[in-house]
Amino acid sequence: MRNTHNPNETEASEDAENDTQSESDLSFDHGSSEKLNRASLPKTQNSAIPQSNALNTTPNESTSQIDSSPKIPSAVPHISTPNPSSGASTPNIKRVSDFKFGEILGEGSYSTVLTATENSTKREYAIKVLDKRHIIKEKKEKYVNIEKEALCILSKHPGFIKLFYTFQDAHNLYFVLSLARNGELLDYINKLGRFNEICAQYYAALIVDSIDYMHGRGVIHRDLKPENILLDDNMRTKITDFGSAKILNSSHGSHEEDTHHADKPQAHSRSFVGTARYVSPEVLSDKIAGTASDIWAFGCILFQMLAGKPPFVAGNEYLTFQSILHLSYEIPPDISDVASDLIKKLLVLDPKDRLTVDEIHQHPFFNGIKFDNTLWELPPPRLKPFGHTSVLSLSVPNASNKHENGDLTSPLGVPSMVSASTNAAPSPVGTFNRGTLLPCQSNLEEENKEWSSILQDDEKISKIGTLNVYSMSGINGNDAFRFFSSLFRKRKPRTFILTNFGRYLCVASDGEGRKTVKEEIPIKSVGMRCRMVKNNEHGWVVETPTKSWSFEDPNGPASAWVELLDKASSISLPFGNHSVTSFSRSIARSAV
């Protein structure tokens, strides 16, 4: 698949040209973020990524400026946006209607990633949809710009997901990205159990070459893990998810002086980024997460490819941190001495003593590997499990045990880019932020008992009712409203439960009393909107980018549901999926 821009695209309409900008328009300005509201935003804005200009732009008069422009030295080639004043023709302004959206690949607190096909070219992409409301509410504007800037800086290397277009509408930001069809590296580790050393050597070489390029351009990822390493059509790696990154000398990133040693103490106000099982010991000690932190994570990934699990695994994050800070891990005895030696030299407590990228290149584990342009031309070895000769099919994995090692989203809450959607295993320490739960009604004790089999521990019913519902896929909610009255007779009565955990469930009971969840309405997904239906006090609509639901409560006002649904959509997600809390880190440090 060649994801290149068509230079022969027709010129945009006059209205679209008025919104055209010489650079991208998705940046935020912390000082003016309060001005970013749905009334002040244009209907649609867009730009293709310029070849040599920055991604940020000076918006037109109808839009609040939402960031100062960082200057980015490199960008996606062959995609440019001429300055409208230059007299050059302007490429089509991208809009949601230019793409046909497919399956959801991943969801996070602030974003959803979907497959999409461009209508005019039939090219397939992964489009990340980021909710402006949540980004501003949670003050995550900086991380949007960091991810965008990092993707642009790294666009000329084959080891990274590429950003092709950016555009926005009144509610969402859209990143049009390359689609890595073969999912996450973690899927294959889970399916094989362990890689043999030939496979591990090849994929480790690709990863370390990408790290070398990334660090050479002043980008520190800070959340490297198998979930953030994707595989393209040719089974070569693509690093993704730069929402946690630090870009040196960036107007959006930190201006701290970075060294390979990363041994300077930091203020406690510094936010943690990363995933518990891959976090470096210097981060747990409140020191700078420098380039050596990525080297530590690379050591964890190499260990996991060869051993089948991360080196630091414990029942909860406190014990995981203790294992990291005490360097408590065991290398399986059947791993070769040369591979064991490399792992030991990567997983070193003091970042000053870890191998540098150049030293990794020279390690005997990579004998026969040339770290030059030819590396990415080598055919990937057929995946084989450790100690076996069977070969894994290169079809897209059906990894039902995906994420059994836990996952922590970046400060954006951004999901993995292009992995197949699967169910995460429950965390041993999963809890909710109790202060944000919906209220429970005291008169629903019988209902709580009746439906207890489908409720989670400590989960209670906040509201229950029999609703008339109609759903439709692939239709914009505004268009859907035109059909609601005529389609009302087709709506089906269903029992819906809204829980204090913020889950909106369509439930059913069969003739034998067995309870099942027929569907969970994704009210926490990015771009979700819930609103009343005009001229119908009993009706409301829930809209997501790919599906809309029309509800009617014949026995009560819609406002009672809408108010609770709005509150439920912002309830904190469980942080038990191996995310790092400051409380656990402080205990771990004090115990060393």
Curated annotation (Swiss-Prot):
<dbReference type="InterPro" id="IPR011009">
    <property type="entry name" value="Kinase-like_dom_sf"/>
</dbReference>
<dbReference type="InterPro" id="IPR000719">
    <property type="entry name" value="Prot_kinase_dom"/>
</dbReference>
<feature type="compositionally biased region" description="Polar residues">
    <location>
        <begin position="80"/>
        <end position="92"/>
    </location>
</feature>
<dbReference type="Pfam" id="PF00069">
    <property type="entry name" value="Pkinase"/>
</dbReference>
<feature type="active site" description="Proton acceptor">
    <location>
        <position position="223"/>
    </location>
</feature>
<dbReference type="InterPro" id="IPR008271">
    <property type="entry name" value="Ser/Thr_kinase_AS"/>
</dbReference>
<dbReference type="InterPro" id="IPR011993">
    <property type="entry name" value="PH-like_dom_sf"/>
</dbReference>
<feature type="binding site">
    <location>
        <begin position="109"/>
        <end position="111"/>
    </location>
    <ligand>
        <name>ATP</name>
    </ligand>
</feature>
<feature type="compositionally biased region" description="Polar residues">
    <location>
        <begin position="1"/>
        <end position="10"/>
    </location>
</feature>
<dbReference type="GO" id="GO:0005524">
    <property type="term" value="F:ATP binding"/>
</dbReference>
<keyword id="KW-0963">Cytoplasm</keyword>
<dbReference type="GO" id="GO:0004672">
    <property type="term" value="F:protein kinase activity"/>
</dbReference>
<feature type="binding site">
    <location>
        <position position="241"/>
    </location>
    <ligand>
        <name>ATP</name>
    </ligand>
</feature>
<feature type="domain" description="PH">
    <location>
        <begin position="461"/>
        <end position="572"/>
    </location>
</feature>
<feature type="domain" description="Protein kinase">
    <location>
        <begin position="99"/>
        <end position="366"/>
    </location>
</feature>
<feature type="binding site">
    <location>
        <position position="128"/>
    </location>
    <ligand>
        <name>ATP</name>
    </ligand>
</feature>
<feature type="compositionally biased region" description="Polar residues">
    <location>
        <begin position="42"/>
        <end position="68"/>
    </location>
</feature>
<feature type="compositionally biased region" description="Basic and acidic residues">
    <location>
        <begin position="27"/>
        <end position="37"/>
    </location>
</feature>
<dbReference type="GO" id="GO:0005547">
    <property type="term" value="F:phosphatidylinositol-3,4,5-trisphosphate binding"/>
</dbReference>
<keyword id="KW-0067">ATP-binding</keyword>
<feature type="binding site">
    <location>
        <position position="227"/>
    </location>
    <ligand>
        <name>ATP</name>
    </ligand>
</feature>
<feature type="region of interest" description="Disordered">
    <location>
        <begin position="1"/>
        <end position="92"/>
    </location>
</feature>
<feature type="compositionally biased region" description="Acidic residues">
    <location>
        <begin position="11"/>
        <end position="22"/>
    </location>
</feature>
<comment type="similarity">
    <text>Belongs to the protein kinase superfamily. AGC Ser/Thr protein kinase family. PDPK1 subfamily.</text>
</comment>
<protein>
    <recommendedName>
        <fullName>Serine/threonine-protein kinase ksg1</fullName>
        <ecNumber>2.7.11.1</ecNumber>
    </recommendedName>
</protein>
<dbReference type="GO" id="GO:0106310">
    <property type="term" value="F:protein serine kinase activity"/>
</dbReference>
<feature type="modified residue" description="Phosphoserine">
    <location>
        <position position="64"/>
    </location>
</feature>
<comment type="function">
    <text>Involved in the control of sexual development and cell growth under stressed conditions. Phosphorylates AGC kinase gad8 at 'Thr-387', activating gad8 kinase activity and promoting sexual development. Phosphorylates AGC kinase psk1 at 'Ser-248', activating psk1 kinase activity and promoting phosphorylation of ribosomal protein S6.</text>
</comment>
<keyword id="KW-0418">Kinase</keyword>
<feature type="binding site">
    <location>
        <position position="184"/>
    </location>
    <ligand>
        <name>ATP</name>
    </ligand>
</feature>
<dbReference type="GO" id="GO:0071852">
    <property type="term" value="P:fungal-type cell wall organization or biogenesis"/>
</dbReference>
<dbReference type="InterPro" id="IPR017441">
    <property type="entry name" value="Protein_kinase_ATP_BS"/>
</dbReference>
<dbReference type="InterPro" id="IPR050236">
    <property type="entry name" value="Ser_Thr_kinase_AGC"/>
</dbReference>
<feature type="region of interest" description="PIF-pocket">
    <location>
        <begin position="130"/>
        <end position="175"/>
    </location>
</feature>
<dbReference type="GO" id="GO:0004674">
    <property type="term" value="F:protein serine/threonine kinase activity"/>
</dbReference>
<dbReference type="Pfam" id="PF14593">
    <property type="entry name" value="PH_3"/>
</dbReference>
<keyword id="KW-0547">Nucleotide-binding</keyword>
<dbReference type="InterPro" id="IPR039046">
    <property type="entry name" value="PDPK1"/>
</dbReference>
<keyword id="KW-0723">Serine/threonine-protein kinase</keyword>
<dbReference type="GO" id="GO:0004676">
    <property type="term" value="F:3-phosphoinositide-dependent protein kinase activity"/>
</dbReference>
<dbReference type="InterPro" id="IPR033931">
    <property type="entry name" value="PDK1-typ_PH"/>
</dbReference>
<feature type="modified residue" description="Phosphoserine">
    <location>
        <position position="69"/>
    </location>
</feature>
